[in-house]
Amino acid sequence: KYLKEQNPNIKIWGIDTYGSVFKKYHETGVFDHNEIYPYSTEGIGEDILPENVDFSIIDLFEKVTDKDAAIFTRNLAKAEGIFAGNSCGAAIKGLLQLKGKLKKTDVVVVLLHDSGSRYIGKIYNDDWMKSKKFLT
């Protein structure tokens, strides 16, 4: 909210997961129970509308699959040395999906707000990744 107050041209893009109601609710104002199903991406998405989400300042939501979130989280660690949580991989993948909306002169800030320490047994575990069919 503060950033938009300082510069109304700032765009805030939220990343959502399949199985969450945020994107559809943001676009239509409808809380659709049919959008809700289990997902493994922790830290994003909801099957409720929390009071701490101010939908009025979010310009759009982009959906990212659980598999893409997990793979991009691991890629952050491997390629960039960033030991991040699963929602961080989702944020990077979501940005890549939205890159067509960007101009060369745009400045992009991605918030990576979670450490990978809570995901050692999941995202950073090959057996878990294989059990979810995220790795072969």
PLM feature segments, named:
Residues 38, 93-136:
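Phosphate-binding loop/pocket of nucleotide- and phosphate-handling active sites
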Residues 4-86, 123-136:
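Active-site/ligand-binding loops adjacent to catalytic centers
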Residues 1, 87-95:
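Short glycine/serine/threonine-rich phosphate/pyrophosphate-binding segments
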